[in-house]
């Protein structure tokens, strides 16, 4: 939260900006004052290898003049600089009109005067650096107790973020938000048998305070992670050039959801406004309401109100309140991820609130919200626990964690790896594998899911490093999901 004096100064600047934008005859305008604090600690083996704790702040002004966008930003938060940036944004909008084919139009949004703060129990920045460093070194020391068996490297990390944002618009909104985010994990590498293999564990990135850094949980997983790294380095390589049944844990499935459902349903990517980082999308608007994206028992739901979700906020960067909606309902593509501009082009009456900028100096763009796979209903014909899926599989592979991945320029064809792999035979896990990859066409993959986990196995996995745009912007989101079983998937090759 801003101090009272700082908030008043910022509100005065925001009022000045909005008045200037209105006086210039713009159809719309907004301003964001943002302050970001980021703290990261990394430990490598027996030493703290990386420590940053920095803060940056500034403001960005966006105007829509005669159907064209203009944007300007600065770190100097003074009346003189603000006036200069508003005028610059207006001049840029005038220049943009010279090469613009179609004018920008926006769906309406109500005016909001509100405050949102991430509910936390412990401010992560109140914990001494020494305590955090000692936790990481303790983790590494315990991992390296397996050095004689073959563990050669240990790495651990902690990441904390605080974002303060004040948003004002010509619609009449004045919204102040404070977002907290926490993340931790570790990795060890076994070297033996002429090979090197790693295993990882993380407390997933979530919008929580230091209470998310559960030391008991982190320390209790060390023995398992080290032993699995050692087993993995001696394990046989996975099969290649065959089809197999896959059982995917949420720790692996979330990235598949991210790449094959999240990005293809970003409406700016569908329209071709955005084509960096794996291109546009096959899920075009002429297929809305008809495309059999997944099996009829599959539902993908967006929810920016999800407690602790990595993209959970009160409002997006256009002042649109957070909400929830389906993008795939009973297997059918039913909606997209939109901001006010793309929603208007689609013919919708309102935005889904997906506009986000990663900095005061960045333009908002459509970003994936919390997007998850709904659990199977109790008693559903395709609902099964992870244990039941394994017991019901004659031959297959169980995958945990994420590895390498790639996807084509329309998000049709993908390949994913993982971090841990186990061979299943006659309903039992018979040992680890290594170097397994699976690949499929997006709609084939999701239509071949024949079992999904119940709500009791729902996990909030996700990413804090989703890149999009040029210049690059980074966003974060949760892909809460359950285990699934998928039939006849290509392995390796």
Functional labels for PLM-detected ranges:
Residues 1-324, 329-332, 426-428, 442, ...:
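Active-site bordering "gate/hinge" segments
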């Amino acid at each position: 939260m801003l101090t009272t004096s700082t908030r008043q100064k910022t509100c005065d600047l925001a009022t000045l900006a909005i008045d200037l934008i209105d006086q210039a005859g713009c159809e719309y305008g907004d301003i964001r004052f943002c302050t970001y604090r980021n703290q990261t600690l990394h430990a490598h083996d027996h030493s703290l290898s990386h420590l940053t704790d920095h803060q940056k702040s500034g403001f960005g002004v966006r105007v829509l003049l005669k159907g064209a966008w203009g944007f300007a930003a600065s770190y100097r938060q003074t009346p003189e600089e603000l006036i200069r940036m508003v005028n610059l944004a207006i001049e840029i909008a005038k220049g943009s009109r010279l090469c613009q084919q179609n004018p920008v139009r926006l769906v309406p949004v109500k005016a909001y005067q509100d405050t949102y703060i991430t509910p936390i129990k412990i401010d992560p920045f109140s914990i001494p650096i020494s305590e955090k460093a000692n936790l990481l070194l303790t983790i590494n020391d315990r991992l390296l107790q397996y050095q004689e068996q073959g563990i050669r490297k240990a790495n651990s990390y902690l990441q904390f973020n605080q974002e303060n944002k004040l948003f004002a618009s010509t619609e009449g909104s004045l919204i102040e938000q404070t977002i907290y985010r926490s993340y931790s994990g570790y990795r060890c590498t076994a070297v033996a048998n002429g090979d090197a293999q790693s295993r990882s564990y993380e407390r997933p990135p979530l919008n929580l305070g230091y209470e998310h850094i559960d030391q008991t949980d982190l320390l209790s997983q060390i023995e398992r992670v080290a032993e699995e790294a050692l087993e993995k380095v001696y394990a046989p390589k996975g099969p290649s050039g065959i089809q197999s049944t896959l059982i995917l844990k949420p720790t692996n499935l979330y990235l598949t959801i991210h790449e094959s459902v999240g990005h293809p349903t970003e409406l700016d990517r569908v329209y071709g406004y955005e084509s960096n980082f794996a291109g546009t999308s096959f899920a075009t608007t002429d297929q809305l309401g008809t495309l059999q994206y997944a099996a009829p028992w599959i539902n993908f739901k967006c929810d920016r109100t999800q407690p602790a979700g990595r993209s959970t906020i009160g409002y997006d960067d256009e002042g649109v309140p957070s909400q929830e909606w389906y993008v795939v309902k009973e297997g059918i593509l039913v909606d997209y991820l939109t901001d006010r501009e793309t929603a208007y082009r689609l013919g919708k009456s309102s935005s889904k609130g997906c506009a986000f900028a990663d900095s005061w100096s960045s333009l908002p763009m459509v970003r994936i919200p919390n997007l998850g796979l709904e659990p199977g209903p109790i008693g559903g014909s395709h609902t099964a626990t992870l244990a039941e899926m394994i017991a019901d599989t004659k031959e297959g592979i169980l995958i945990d964690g994420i590895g390498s991945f790639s996807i084509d320029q329309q998000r049709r064809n993908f390949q994913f790896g993982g971090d841990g792999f186990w061979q299943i035979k006659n309903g039992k896990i018979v040992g680890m594998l290594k170097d397994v990859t699976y690949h499929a066409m997006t709609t084939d993959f999701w239509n071949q899911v024949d079992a999904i986990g119940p709500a009791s196995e729902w996990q909030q996995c996700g990413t804090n490093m989703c890149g999009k745009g040029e210049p690059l912007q980074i966003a974060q989101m949760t892909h809460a999901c359950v285990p699934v079983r998928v039939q006849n998937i290509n392995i390796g090759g």
